[in-house]
Structures are given as C-alpha cells and as structure tokens.
Amino acid sequence: MTEYKIVIVGGGLVGKSALTLQLVQVCIKDQYYLIEFQNNQFQFENLQNHYIDEYDPTVEDSRREVSIDDQTCLLNILDTAGQQHSNAQSMDAHWSTVFVCLFNYFNITSMYDEIASFREQILRVKDGAKDLVPLILIINKADLDHESQGSGNEGQLAKDSLSFHQSSAKSRINLEEIPYSLVRELRKELKLDQSSGKAQKKKKQCLII
C-alpha cells in the first residue's frame, strides 16, 4: 500500500489541528461543533452537554486509509502546531511527500508573500527540484464572514499554478475533496516523472516554517 506523508504548515490560529483531526476523522464528529481551542485542548459542544477532548499536536500522529480512484493508500498527516519557529527552521526531515499550506480569511492579505517565501525555502532544500515538491494551499474558515478580508491574491495564486482550496474544519466544507486532491496531485507528479525517465528514489527533506 502506498503511503503519502503530508505536512500541514501555517501561522498561528489558522486551524491546522482542527483540520488535521477532521481529515482523519479522529475526534470531531458530524453531530458536534468545535467551540474553541485553548491550552492544547479542543472543546466541543452538542445539543445536550459540553465536554473536553485532549489533543497534543506535538505527539499525536494521524493516519487514514482511503480508496482513491480504486486504489487504496495510507495518508499520514503531520500537524506542525505547537512547534517553535527556530526548531522548525532547523528541522532536517526525510519525511514529507507533499506540503499543505494553511491560511484563513483573516490573514489572507499576507497569504501570497508567505506562500512564495515558503515555496522558495522548499525548493532550496529540495535542490530546486520543483516537480518533486507538490504544494497545495488551503484557505480555511470559509464558513466565516470574510468579505471585508478579500483581496486579489487568489487570482495571482491561480496564475502561478498553485493549487488551492477553500475549507472549513468546523462546517466540514471540502474536507473529503482535499485528501483526494492531494493524492491525485502526487500521482500526477510521479507519472510525469516516470514518463520523463527520471523516476528514482531520492532522499526527501522538508523545511517547516
């Protein structure tokens, strides 16, 4: 079974942990609603009561087996929430096969500059091998009122051929589409690499920022 290793990165409070939990269907169920995240704990509410589920993104790993286009694969998702910036910068990881950069509509105005910087650093540690660095952008919290935060950056991202999606971890918007897009992007890259006669095992590195 093919395993796809996914690193989710982004600034503070963009919803990395909530999205990770939703993608692997660990804690958040359809009948519950995420209220807040404080001190590495998620608080959920249903119609009857309140309760607390503990979650530590620095130790929890998240795996999900899925069938995509009649092929079964394993998604292994790394949530970088809680990592200090200095530690992340120096992290030498032979781990990731795809990067997910997460933003929300309240930091969208700085999104393009940040994604460009992140992509540049990935390419540097990947020795400039652009075709080996699948990168997908997710704009989270699509359920919130964001009209006042709008900008023209989405069009620029599309022009630069960056794949991006809108999502909501709370409302489960596009949560099933995202892993399908990730895997299909990876398979597409591998197929192109093989057709060029370049397919070979290479050491993987990633830089988390």
Curated annotation (Swiss-Prot):
Cellular compartment(s): Cell membrane
GO molecular function, one term: GTP binding
Predominant place of localization: membrane
Source taxon at top rank: Eukaryota
Chain positions found as Phosphothreonine: 58
Membrane disposition: Lipid-anchor
GO terms, biological process: signal transduction
UniProt key word Phosphoprotein: yes
Key words, A-Z: Cell membrane, GTP-binding, Hydrolase, Lipoprotein, Membrane, Methylation, Nucleotide-binding, Phosphoprotein, Prenylation
Motif (Effector region): 55-63
Binding site for GTP: 10-17, 79-83, 140-143
Catalysed reactions, as listed in the record: GTP + H2O = GDP + phosphate + H(+)
Pfam families linked to this entry: Ras
GO annotations of cellular component type: plasma membrane
Regulation affecting activity: Alternates between an inactive form bound to GDP and an active form bound to GTP. Activated by a guanine nucleotide-exchange factor (GEF) and inactivated by a GTPase-activating protein (GAP).
Residues bearing a lipid moiety (S-geranylgeranyl cysteine): 206
Propeptide: 207-209
Residue numbers carrying Cysteine methyl ester: 206
PTMs per UniProt: Phosphorylated in the presence of insulin.
Name under which the protein is recorded: Ras-like protein
Organism: Geodia cydonium (Sponge)
Lineage: Eukaryota, Metazoa, Porifera, Demospongiae, Heteroscleromorpha
